[in-house]
């Protein structure tokens, strides 16, 4: 039963090119990225955390609307951002902002990441996910999507090619890899992202930068799978940590 909210708030118009499609809809990470950017534009502050619910697929090549409303302004702020299409809310996010640039991250121990050159070029199936035309992936470790392995983990260097705002690109990176559950499967399944929470650290990666993504399915049942991911820059510095809920549509 579709219970998406009708009469969404007015906002700026946006039409996403079909090349950013993943399966039948616009990639969820791109949607989250636009919500992050809308919150930053409204507040003039730095997004530090986001929780987004993806309520319906966003159709490419069809006009959508992005709107943002402040719930709190100040040094610590909170912004509600929505993307709507066909008169209903398709995605909603609550974005925590801080009115200063992100400071250096202090970790208990330095984290070493393998060089980009260690990665093996891996191409997503462009007929199913045209966003592959914008995505360069260098896979690391033994696991591959639909490889029938024993560990539900995917690790890779990822680079996004495309003229995207930095926060929009970051959203795409948060959702760039297939579901890690695919590493232990041999057949594909429809597992769209329905929720994504991320904590953002350090400066947003520059356009076209390589980002290390280590993603693992922490648990799954017959209806959902939960993936945790860590994103790092080439120097090992933390970019973001994310958790997303994927809905298994075969039930």
Map each language-model feature to its residues.
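Terminal targeting signals and extreme-terminal segments of soluble enzymes
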Residues: 1-251
